[in-house]
Amino acid sequence: GHIFDKDMDLSFRWEEMYRYYACIVGKYGSFVQKVLTKFKEANLPVQYICSTHGPVWTPAHFSEAFDLYDRMSRYEAEEGAVVLYGTMYGNTEVLADTIAQGIAAGGIRNVVCHNVAFSPASNILRDIFKYKAVIIGSPTYSNEIFSPIKNIMEMIRLREVKDRYLSVFGSFTWAGQAVKKIVPFAEEMGWEMVGEPLEQKMSTTDELYEKGWELGNKIAERLKADRQ
């Protein structure tokens, strides 16, 4: 393919920059900020940026590339929501879809859903770095958080992602444990909880469907409150 930014459609490249940053740079935002500051102060006559991962950047896109890294390194997110969930029998997935529909109906355009058993972890992390609201749903498995969800939570923890909104939901058959074990993640990460955690026993009832929709609306309202 092409080598220079001016010769290609960059829409895919911006998404890849998010994905690379989330997976590789992640927690080192303070160091990125220091480098960006030094670079600006040096005022070097740069003609090309030859990145090891991505195209050769020309001055036409310098500001966009620097602005994106500046925002990511400050954990500044776009308006949007990431619903990540695990499901064993499909019940948690139904609730995930319901919450996502409530968010969209509340006026939020960017709503992404990830079944953690199938979505690549790199794509999930990319979207968490990109969007402000994170909604985590898990069934209870052997009195614990579903393992794929637990793994993603650990990846988020290692990257020290800051300044996000968190909502929690889940399902169980015998004894509900997953939801109550996810809730403390908000305090651990310094995130703001939005809405009351939702938990269903087995399949979704009409009442819980309504509550899922309402939670989605609350998330949308919290996101819209940040508009200026």
Regions inferred by a protein language model and the residue ranges of each:
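Short aromatic-enriched loop/helix-cap "lid" or pocket-rim segments at secondary-structure transitions
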Residues: 1-2, 61-64, 180
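FMN-binding flavodoxin-like domain, especially the glycine-rich phosphate-binding loop
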Residues: 3-50, 54-56, 98-112, 124-228
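Terminal amphipathic helices with adjacent charged low-complexity linkers/tails
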Residues: 48-81
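A general structural motif
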Residues: 61-68, 94-95, 114-123, 144-152
